[in-house]
């Protein structure tokens, strides 16, 4: 026994020395463990630097890899993913995980290929500004009873979903060679009562049980909805339902798109919160502000300068590191598009979110700044085990500076996170920082914070064998252990940096660049000081260390592409590249370093591989002219796209057809669904009978068309109330004549109007009231009175002047819950006649009876038109050119406009509400090389008519790319088939 114990301890010591650690596990797997410091995967501590990504909001699976490569290149090692029940289940008992973007196996495969772990978040409720919070729309009509509780009716609905999606998640766990390391239970569910029999506790236990049935063994997690409660932590009132890893969501910015001086107030109480409520677990922020959503009538994301500023990640994300957070997920990192009718009413078509990666997949400065943090955390292993040594304003010579002081108890490495105490200030402050090192107390001079700037100052920072920084006032971006140890610093131009190598004599060095290095002696070693010049400076030291000094702009274009596919990248498993817009990947083969990437403009490219046998650079498969520097790097030129002229076709050949024939009294609606219910499963009682809630008749997303009949000439009008979400308008006609309606309001989900009937238009019998309603989504759970169950459609309709309606019929999207277009899915289309007939689909042949009219002509009264055109693109094969459609309308226009590209509804334009008028299309929805079908539906909300004054294709940026955008997207664009049965 003693021999066994000795051998066990010896082995443990060896494993610990190799960086392998043990920790708490969940009793199901030891592949993912944790302690109060960090998560560990396969025995290796990991700083989880994750980005939120929603595959549903980018319906081209091949582009998921494009996004993942960009995240990996910019320092991320994980993605957090919602799986929306609504996207996969058009009707009860039916689940689609195969067609198009519904094939989530490809999501896991691409994540693994890109080198990213996955945090799975399947709900069943998600929120996420998506329609009904991600609940299947067929169930969001009251039939689930008390949602998000242990109600049996609810349980019976969500259980099949979690079982089905859970099996796929389970197949892709780290234990099975997949990328999934955490599985979230529910979403922001506040634990209101600590009682083992409480319905929420029972509900969370049910979720855990069903995930276990599905085969999930990785640790569970949950995300607290801000500091509003303490929920599901094993360290606080654990009466059941607790998860393994507690997390806290936080959106602290308080920023304004219209006032650049608002907000920017840091939260400095995260550490105390986690110490109080999850002290045996690592500090986890499952959702930390990567931007913020904008409502109908709000601002457009491109105008939100404060949200887009790189100052935000620099200050806020470093503050989180100072708070000892080691699981950090940014919501959103790529937002995407609320295409079709997938949005909740709180947002419009774009879900750009002012995220680091633009909706068009373009890299913002915000992402470039985020990369500096991601690459730092990737190599800074001592950061993964620290305690809070202290914090406050007493660490510097200036009390306006706030400091977090973290210490690794094993290595004595220190991390001092600095920011202005008043985080919103724009003051420039120079000060001295007092630090504790292995050489004693040291005062580091001439540290500057330029307004909304933060810095992480390291002490006793190891960056390779026999290589340690005693301290550095320049920030460390990353380091590499190659043939020599390579250290990369960054500062703003003009800022001063000072560093000391631990236990090193005065070193000789050679400088290459604009930043001049000087030395001075001290009791703790030679100090090396410099003022950051513009661009890149390399310094070769006599101890072999190579140091790069980068200004911020150069750091933004600095990459460390891994040479491993693992999300965990050791310092000897990446090379260093400076210059291009994006470096997707790199490898060394037969004396050549092969790099794939993207460039907007031609740039220099410098590569350090640490391999003296490497003589050439291949950029996107082509060898470029290369020279070798005195310090061992290779330099060449990476071509860009600045000389490429993008000529987009004008859209001047349109055909138009009536998309509201139902207005006419003689329209045949005999095959429509009869509205004859006198009771509803919905707990909200209708204002009149019969029930006219669209969900009760199997129509959920998109436009609805109602036709109600009544008799008599004495009726003077009708009182109608419609509820289809914020900003949703509606219009009504009696026997073909416009009778009124509502243009909708961003502040109202339901609107009422008293319709006025012209007596001359009425008949003794069989008058027809046609009501056409727009739709902006189902509410999320937090919206009163009943959240996702708040009904859609007509809440009430009564005649004025005597009598009742004799009948009602409804028509919605073609097929209702049948999901006749499984590739695009159940939320793409609504019930406009042109949609039901498939006029928006590729291959539809416009009849000769269609008029030659464009959206610029519009309609003169309360009418609707469906406009179609085709155009061809022939972009170069190696180009990524995001393309969108710019719309405009005369002031005062009140209309509902939809944009369809190759069958996908990728634009919902309300010119009277705004703010969005520019709608981008990703490749795969638009064909960059080939024919495209563009359709625009437009119906006027008043008898003043409606038209557009701008309809033109626009290009965003243009990039020479190593990614294959020249693919056959045909499988994503199923064509037209006869739909006459849905008239």
UniProtKB/Swiss-Prot annotation:
It holds the Pfam family BetaGal_ABD2. Substrate binds at residues 82, 127-129, 187, 251, 353. GO terms for biological process: galactose catabolic process; polysaccharide catabolic process. InterPro entries: Betagal_dom2 (IPR018954), Betagal_dom2_sf (IPR037110), BetaGal_dom3 (IPR025972), BetaGal_dom3_sf (IPR036833), BetaGal_jelly_roll_dom (IPR025300), Galactose-bd-like_sf (IPR008979), Gly_Hdrlase_35_cat (IPR031330), Glycoside_Hdrlase_35 (IPR001944). The active site is at residues 188, 287. Disulfide bonds join 257-304. Residues 1-23 form the signal peptide. It is an enzyme of class 3 (hydrolase). It is found in: Secreted. Glycans are attached at residues 197, 276, 391, 434, 466, 516, 601, 676, 714, 719, 758, 804. Keywords: Carbohydrate metabolism, Disulfide bond, Glycoprotein, Glycosidase, Hydrolase, Polysaccharide degradation, Secreted, Signal. One of its GO terms (molecular function) is beta-galactosidase activity. Its main location: secreted. It catalyses: Hydrolysis of terminal non-reducing beta-D-galactose residues in beta-D-galactosides. GO terms for cellular component: extracellular region; vacuole. Gene3D superfamilies: Beta-galactosidase, domain 2 (2.102.20.10), Beta-galactosidase, domain 3 (2.60.390.10), Galactose-binding domain-like (2.60.120.260), Glycosidases (3.20.20.80). Its EC number is 3.2.1.23. Belongs to the glycosyl hydrolase 35 family. Cleaves beta-linked terminal galactosyl residues from gangliosides, glycoproteins, and glycosaminoglycans. This is Probable beta-galactosidase C. It comes from Aspergillus fumigatus (strain ATCC MYA-4609 / CBS 101355 / FGSC A1100 / Af293) (Neosartorya fumigata).
